[in-house]
Amino acid sequence: MERPLENGDESPDSQGHATDWRFAVCSFRDAWEEEEPASQMHVKDPGPPRPPAGATQDEELQGSPLSRKFQLPPAADESGDAQRGTVESSSVLSEGPGPSGVESLLCPMSSHLSLAQGESDTPGVGLVGDPGPSRAMPSGLSPGALDSDPVGLGDPLSEISKLLEAAPSGSGLPKPADCLLAQDLCWELLASGMATLPGTRDVQGRAVLLLCAHSPAWLQSECSSQELIRLLLYLRSIPRPEVQALGLTVLVDARICAPSSSLFSGLSQLQEAAPGAVYQVLLVGSTLLKEVPSGLQLEQLPSQSLLTHIPTAGLPTSLGGGLPYCHQAWLDFRRRLEALLQNCQAACALLQGAIESVKAVPQPMEPGEVGQLLQQTEVLMQQVLDSPWLAWLQCQGGRELTWLKQEVPEVTLSPDYRTAMDKADELYDRVDGLLHQLTLQSNQRIQALELVQTLEARESGLHQIEVWLQQVGWPALEEAGEPSLDMLLQAQGSFQELYQVAQEQVRQGEKFLQPLTGWEAAELDPPGARFLALRAQLTEFSRALAQRCQRLADAERLFQLFREALTWAEEGQRVLAELEQERPGVVLQQLQLHWTRHPDLPPAHFRKMWALATGLGSEAIRQECRWAWARCQDTWLALDQKLEASLKLPPVGSTASLCVSQVPAAPAHPPLRKAYSFDRNLGQSLSEPACHCHHAATIAACRRPEAGGGALPQASPTVPPPGSSDPRSLNRLQLVLAEMVATEREYVRALEYTMENYFPELDRPDVPQGLRGQRAHLFGNLEKLRDFHCHFFLRELEACTRHPPRVAYAFLRHRVQFGMYALYSKNKPRSDALMSSYGHTFFKDKQQALGDHLDLASYLLKPIQRMGKYALLLQELARACGGPTQELSALREAQSLVHFQLRHGNDLLAMDAIQGCDVNLKEQGQLVRQDEFVVRTGRHKSVRRIFLFEELLLFSKPRHGPTGVDTFAYKRSFKMADLGLTECCGNSNLRFEIWFRRRKARDTFVLQASSLAIKQAWTADISHLLWRQAVHNKEVRMAEMVSMGVGNKAFRDIAPSEEAINDRTVNYVLKCREVRSRASIAVAPFDHDSLYLGASNSLPGDPASCSVLGSLNLHLYRDPALLGLRCPLYPSFPEEAALEAEAELGGQPSLTAEDSEISSQCPSASGSSGSDSSCVSGQALGRGLEDLPCV
């Protein structure tokens, strides 16, 4: 494109702006703020003055900053009008060069800028001088400039070129009155001062037009009626529109001479051209008019009466007022202001057209179009930024604004000054904003095109990757149907080869598509969106590849677990086949040898196996898992039956040779027995001590080791059930168990009945709005309960018919699954609310259709009733069992479990009602208890609701709401690790004391319970937690010592001795409260091994004193003989519910495998969610599966 310069040179600022437009947005406002304010100039010389007519062209352009850029050729006739074709710096761009084709027609606009006089849709945008067809266009801005551009432009620019060629270069139409500029007027008339607008306002706020009757310009030849009316219209257009609407007050100064006739004729024409333009004419002077012009309201006034119409402060000094006015300063201000406004308006129109043009550029549909559109956009932006208006504004715009804002009283005191400057600032800021918008939009457009162009250069490589994904990658990851374990194992070899190639393909594709980071599909063209789709496909393939790799690794791990389980089962079957015809003594020895070499698989083995099978998501693999578990279970049961058969009493003395070792006399405190009992069928009584001791030794020789191996424990004499020989007692046990099994079957049928008939009702289209999506809240975890009882618990109850007391182990083994009843109880109030609001009415039709006399609410109450039934039946079994036997202890533990779950649901509801708590209660372990106490601290007494967690003791203040719902305001909490307990405090049996280590003696809390039972339960639970913490701390210290190289040998006594630590007790009454430790609690030495807090009674011989250090005997904690009721009798493998996540019921804790693992680390608690697998003796397959969740 040919540059609009005369000699080929260009402004450095213009060049910099044009070449740096893609990376920096030129802000004219910033440029103006950085410029030094222009030096104060005399008001009569604000800038290069306009030369009079007849001056040479060189004189006109001398001193103009743009004189070397734009020079208009003289007209052919060299008339005065042609001489006015060249102007000074303030108006050269307005009168001289018009916009070129691209600058004025960058997009199909409704109108375009032209050089024709009066052709403009925007006020003040016309860039013409005096009318006449002789005005010429600079060659650099002619339409022919586009013809010389070698760049092939797209359709928008072609349309621009066509429109430009059809645009006329001039027009003789008159300019609208509101678009007149100073350059459109006769300079001699404007500069003469015959008509001025000094900024005066009359008393009614009208603008005052001052006409000097004594001005010689009224007699000049240039003062034609046309020029006069143009001058008056121009002056009228300067005030604000609201002031123009009031009309002008024309003040005629006729004090020296009478006004000429042309003055009043001009006013009459002004009134005709713009009705209401002249409100009144005030004639100041003593001259009397012979004829009053028509259409004008004329009033002759003496100079003294003028103040009644115009205030003194508004009158110019020439009329005796106080308003300073200099016509030359006013002229300079108007010329510079109008030049700035013209360039801003032209630049705004240009930039708006360019923005629309960039938006109108078509999207590239073919790869070859990207380069053409990119070059077209760059040329478009280059031409826009090379436009003379932007160049002038960049070079002089800031200086012009600075000059216009100089404090010149002759100009700034006029009310029209602020209006003009506000308009100038607005237009200047608009140019700045439009340029910023255009630059950002164009840069983003060009960057997107360049990005697509870069990716097109890599098209071949990306196409190869895409083809590989479609033909090789994705088909290789697909699985035909539901895979089996063998199929997954066979796929490992081919997958390793695929994995290496796939990683290379993904890496190469990500390297190619790296420039797409941060781009969205809406910001790119269709070719770019295609590359984005390829990147998304690569990301998805990488994820699928990683999942496939993990899936095959899980399959391999699962195969190893399968192989270990099957190997264990096959070895057991082999031993059983060999012992088929052997004598009982040989059977016992061989079984002992077998369990020594092949200990039972730990529960974690089957948990991991089921987790992997569930993660693989194949029913066939899960079926294989069930088959392996069933085979192991059958083997374990066969071995157990073989052991029981071999333990039947032979004739006296016949098994003496089988005794491995003699057992010493029983200690004063006999330890608890294993979870299973081998002497239940012996039928011996306490009157047969010799035989009993002999048989105990035999059992000790045949007892199974732990899952991880280890030495065999010593046996202890057991006491057979006293009522085992009583037929009536056995009959009673059988009857109670039969009732339990029968009611269990009815309970399972009721749960299935509810699910089959009422669950589908919520899928009906007419379900009430309040019940939509409320299945989990209405029914709770009823489906999980049904699965547990139907698939597991009912079967185990039925298997206990041979020995009814074993029912207790079924409860204890599934303590985690019974935790679902606490969640069900917690959700029950919400379920009842839904039933009362919507359920009774909605489900009534279904009840009538079924012909059932029980409604849904009755069936939803059955789980709560069933737990109460369990408690009664277990109580009956305990009464029938009688005596302090192992089975009796297990039954009591099961009772405690049931009672705890019944209470725990209410405890969870109370925990949810705690408000303002800044402690995460989910991280504090199981909620054990919550009750209301009277708390005394010093002299202060208050009522507090206290919550006991495994890791925290929380105090809250009960608040009773108006609706009867209690809430609890959080007050304080203490870590259990810092707590100490004094079980008896004061004279009352209802009080106990809580104190803290490393604190002052007065920092204690005395808690008074409402009943003795509550007090005993709380002290027992707290004691249990403190014992467990003491044991845990001891183990941690031992582990730390081993890791530091201290105590690298096992701590074991070679032989029993009176000097051994375990035979000593330390009884020391502390004399100072500050030195008490957390072990100073009144608790049985082995009570920490109980399964449920507050469940077991104190053993005989327990210390009963308060704040006394008893025999901790921590070295016996891991003695297998003390683990008692940890080992279940029958294995139970949790199927689909083992590791499936349960949907939380309104924030209820879900029973997942992870929760079971966490809770299983705490073997405690009457509300414990599980048992510590490390504390389980691992007697048989699944014997520790009581901590597996069933949900």
Swiss-Prot record:
<dbReference type="InterPro" id="IPR011993">
    <property type="entry name" value="PH-like_dom_sf"/>
</dbReference>
<dbReference type="InterPro" id="IPR036865">
    <property type="entry name" value="CRAL-TRIO_dom_sf"/>
</dbReference>
<dbReference type="Pfam" id="PF22697">
    <property type="entry name" value="SOS1_NGEF_PH"/>
</dbReference>
<dbReference type="GO" id="GO:0005085">
    <property type="term" value="F:guanyl-nucleotide exchange factor activity"/>
</dbReference>
<dbReference type="GO" id="GO:0005737">
    <property type="term" value="C:cytoplasm"/>
</dbReference>
<feature type="compositionally biased region" description="Polar residues">
    <location>
        <begin position="111"/>
        <end position="120"/>
    </location>
</feature>
<dbReference type="InterPro" id="IPR035899">
    <property type="entry name" value="DBL_dom_sf"/>
</dbReference>
<feature type="compositionally biased region" description="Low complexity">
    <location>
        <begin position="1159"/>
        <end position="1176"/>
    </location>
</feature>
<dbReference type="InterPro" id="IPR055251">
    <property type="entry name" value="SOS1_NGEF_PH"/>
</dbReference>
<protein>
    <recommendedName>
        <fullName>Puratrophin-1</fullName>
    </recommendedName>
</protein>
<dbReference type="Pfam" id="PF00621">
    <property type="entry name" value="RhoGEF"/>
</dbReference>
<dbReference type="GO" id="GO:0019898">
    <property type="term" value="C:extrinsic component of membrane"/>
</dbReference>
<feature type="region of interest" description="Disordered">
    <location>
        <begin position="1"/>
        <end position="152"/>
    </location>
</feature>
<dbReference type="GO" id="GO:0005886">
    <property type="term" value="C:plasma membrane"/>
</dbReference>
<feature type="region of interest" description="Disordered">
    <location>
        <begin position="1150"/>
        <end position="1176"/>
    </location>
</feature>
<dbReference type="GO" id="GO:0051056">
    <property type="term" value="P:regulation of small GTPase mediated signal transduction"/>
</dbReference>
<feature type="region of interest" description="Disordered">
    <location>
        <begin position="707"/>
        <end position="728"/>
    </location>
</feature>
<dbReference type="GO" id="GO:0005829">
    <property type="term" value="C:cytosol"/>
</dbReference>
<dbReference type="InterPro" id="IPR052231">
    <property type="entry name" value="Rho_GEF_signaling-related"/>
</dbReference>
<feature type="modified residue" description="Phosphoserine">
    <location>
        <position position="64"/>
    </location>
</feature>
<keyword id="KW-0344">Guanine-nucleotide releasing factor</keyword>
<keyword id="KW-0597">Phosphoprotein</keyword>
<feature type="domain" description="DH">
    <location>
        <begin position="732"/>
        <end position="908"/>
    </location>
</feature>
<dbReference type="InterPro" id="IPR001849">
    <property type="entry name" value="PH_domain"/>
</dbReference>
<dbReference type="InterPro" id="IPR000219">
    <property type="entry name" value="DH_dom"/>
</dbReference>
<dbReference type="GO" id="GO:0007411">
    <property type="term" value="P:axon guidance"/>
</dbReference>
<feature type="domain" description="PH">
    <location>
        <begin position="920"/>
        <end position="1027"/>
    </location>
</feature>
<comment type="function">
    <text>Possible role in intracellular signaling and cytoskeleton dynamics at the Golgi.</text>
</comment>
